[in-house]
């Protein structure tokens, strides 16, 4: 049987995650932002490509054939027909491909240091007692990360399709090797990649959801769960919940694209949050690493931190000012289309100011959690994330940055880890890694997992 086919038991109570409100079927028309449908459906064999991958770089952005934003609704059928009430076994997996992982982990094999490193390296471990904050005295708990360790690693190259990437499978193999040297056991690591020969180990939408069920099953305080996704990401228009409220300050939900997204749809951030965060008990750690476009808030964690270690808030005036600057530059160069676009962007920012503030507060009210969830993502919600080649190996820029920092000096704080990853990427890429959390955190505490 495949991961996730079982009920969760926390404190003697059984919980069965309901997925009915998330129905993202195939699109009925062309997707937003000019992405047309691909020339054909994904191949059925999911075998290796007939030749070496091309040498140019792509971003981990919306694949062609993505779904129309105004056609997604939080309603409808259950996601999958299986009953989650049986046992659970991790899928059998073939031996690793020798051709894809010969260089080893980034940051090892004598690679040079990446330059200036932030932080003194003297960091306190997170407190083990219950924490509280806010006027309602909301409680949460850091994880000691000394319980069971489990990991789910998802890498999708979209082999043989128009959306093909080169780095995700390598990223998964590299992260797996990293985790094996940090207390994780191979029997507690599940990999889903599209070069697998085992059907249940292929990263389809249902397999990913089932594997997430396995990851969170029987989670307990001080367990350490690790989720890594490398592949395409995108956005879709935020839809109101049953009370008519929105939780995205920019008006868009973030999504990830399974291998079969064209037929079975994407996976939206609300669903990821409900499965990976809401189900966890206080003191259980979920460390999520997203190497995909538009991934800044893809786990819907309401507390986002800057490289100064302070909470970020929506900056509508800054966005409006950027639109006015674009309009002025377009006027100077005689670009009438650019003038209109810049002014429209500025007006839209002002109009969205009220909704943005309300959505941000509503997100904190509904998405704050007592567990210890942390998300490290490759870029802001409005940015793309690079699929690149570093040291002769195809890799995602974010996966590379995380592994390089942690391999060269695993004694990091939340803040120094974020700063050092940005340092690695800023010389070649415009993307800015993001740090979000399920509760307020002290960014100067030691990053453990």
From Swiss-Prot:
Pfam families assigned to the protein according to its UniProt record, in alphabetical order: Peptidase_C14
The keyword Ribosomal protein appears for this protein: no
E.C. designation(s): 3.4.22.-
Low complexity composition bias: residue spans: 10-26, 67-91, 98-112
Enzyme class, first EC level, given as a word: hydrolase
Region of interest: Disordered: 1-132
Annotated GO biological process: apoptotic process; proteolysis
Active-site residues per Swiss-Prot or TrEMBL entry: 232, 293
Annotated GO CC locations: cytoplasm
Biased composition (Pro residues): 27-55
Keywords, alphabetical: Apoptosis, Hydrolase, Protease, Thiol protease, Zymogen
Top-rank lineage group of the source organism: Eukaryota
Biased composition, class Polar residues, residue ranges: 56-66, 119-132
GO molecular function, one term: cysteine-type endopeptidase activity
Purpose: Involved in cell death (apoptosis).
Family: Belongs to the peptidase C14B family.
Family matches, as PANTHER family: METACASPASE-1, METACASPASE-4
Name of the protein described by the UniProt record: Metacaspase-1
Species annotation: Lodderomyces elongisporus (strain ATCC 11503 / CBS 2605 / JCM 1781 / NBRC 1676 / NRRL YB-4239) (Yeast)
Native organism taxonomy: Eukaryota, Fungi, Dikarya, Ascomycota, Saccharomycotina
Gene this protein is translated from: MCA1
């Amino acid at each position: 049987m495949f991961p996730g086919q079982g009920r969760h038991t926390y404190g003697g109570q059984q919980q069965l995650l309901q997925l009915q409100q998330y129905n993202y079927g195939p699109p009925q028309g062309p997707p937003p932002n000019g992405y047309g449908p691909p020339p054909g459906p994904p191949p059925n064999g999911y075998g290796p490509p007939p030749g070496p991958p091309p040498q140019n770089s792509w971003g981990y952005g919306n694949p062609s054939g993505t779904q129309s934003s105004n056609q997604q609704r939080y309603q409808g059928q259950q996601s999958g027909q299986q009953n989650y009430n049986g046992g659970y076994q991790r899928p059998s997996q073939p031996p690793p491909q020798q051709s894809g992982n010969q260089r080893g982990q980034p940051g090892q094999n004598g690679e040079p240091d990446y330059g200036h490193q932030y932080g003194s390296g003297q960091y306190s471990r997170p407190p083990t007692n219950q924490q509280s904050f806010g006027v309602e005295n909301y409680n949460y708990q850091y994880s000691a990360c000394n319980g069971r360790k489990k990991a789910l690693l998802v890498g999708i190259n979209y082999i043989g399709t128009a959306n093909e990437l080169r780095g995700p499978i390598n990223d998964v193999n590299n992260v797996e090797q990293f985790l094996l040297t940090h207390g994780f056991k191979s029997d507690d690591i599940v990999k889903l990649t599209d070069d697998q020969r085992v059907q249940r180990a292929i990263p389809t939408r249902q397999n990913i959801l089932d594997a997430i069920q396995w990851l969170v099953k029987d989670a307990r305080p001080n367990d350490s769960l690790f989720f890594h996704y490398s592949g395409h990401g995108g956005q879709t228009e935020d839809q109101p919940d049953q009370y008519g409220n929105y939780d995205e300050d920019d008006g868009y939900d973030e999504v990830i694209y399974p291998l079969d997204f064209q037929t079975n749809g994407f996976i939206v951030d609300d669903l990821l949050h409900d499965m990976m965060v809401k189900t966890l008990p206080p003191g259980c750690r979920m460390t999520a690493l997203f190497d995909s476009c538009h991934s800044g808030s893809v786990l819907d964690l309401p507390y986002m931190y800057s490289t100064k270690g302070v909470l970020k808030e929506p900056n509508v005036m800054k966005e409006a000012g950027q639109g006015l600057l674009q309009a002025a530059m377009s006027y100077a160069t005689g670009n009438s289309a650019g003038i209109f676009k810049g002014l429209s962007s500025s007006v839209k920012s002002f109009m969205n100011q009220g909704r943005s503030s309300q959505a941000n507060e509503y997100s904190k009210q509904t998405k704050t959690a007592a567990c210890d969830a942390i998300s490290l993502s490759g870029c802001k919600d409005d940015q793309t994330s690079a699929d690149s080649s570093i040291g002769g190996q195809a890799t995602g820029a974010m996966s590379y940055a995380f592994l390089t920092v942690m391999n060269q000096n695993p004694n990091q704080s939340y803040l120094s880890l974020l700063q050092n990853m940005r340092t690695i990427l800023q010389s070649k890429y415009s993307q800015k890694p993001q740090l979000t959390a399920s509760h307020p955190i002290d960014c100067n505490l030691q990053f453990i997992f």
